[in-house]
Amino acid sequence: MCIRTAKNVDVSAILEVAHATPWEKDEYLRRQIGLGHVEILCEGDSVVAFIAWNAEFFSKPFVWLVVVRPDRREQGIAGRLFAAVEARCAGLRLYSSTNRSNVAMHRLFVRRGYRRAGELELDPGDSEAFYCIDL
């Protein structure tokens, strides 16, 4: 397995992984790939997972999407992708968020040393919890 920055040639494979979950942001993701803000985890020629981030959150780095193929979840892959983004953001404060209902992501944030930064009621009944870490 390897983790590397996604390139435009990876778009189709990344969108295939993305569409394993409800998805409607293809163009935004394409733009982030072009800017070098998407890291992918590959096995051979196959994209297993990706993480997308940018500095559009109050000019701070923010991980806005992590997707792991359903058959590869709960194997530490998301943590490896977070480590790759954290390395790129060394010396900064990195933010991310997840819905209250996403227990696996809350556990990942705690394991990686993130602290709770706040909460917004974006989805009725399933608020968004924000986390951050100083790198």
Predicted features and spans:
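Conserved GNAT acetyl-CoA-binding A-motif
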Residues: 88-100
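A short, internal acetyl-CoA/4′-phosphopantetheine-binding micro-motif in the GNAT/acyltransferase core
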Residues: 65-73, 98-100
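Conserved active-site alpha-helix within GNAT-family acetyltransferase domains
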Residues: 79, 100-119, 126
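Acetyl-CoA-dependent GNAT
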Residues: 5-64, 69, 82, 122
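Conserved acetyl-CoA-binding loop-helix of GNAT-fold acetyltransferases
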Residues: 68, 74-87, 107, 111
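Short hydrophobic/aromatic beta-strand or adjacent loop that forms the aromatic wall/cage
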Residues: 36, 126-131
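Conserved N-terminal entry element of GNAT/NAT acetyltransferase domains
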Residues: 1-9, 133-135
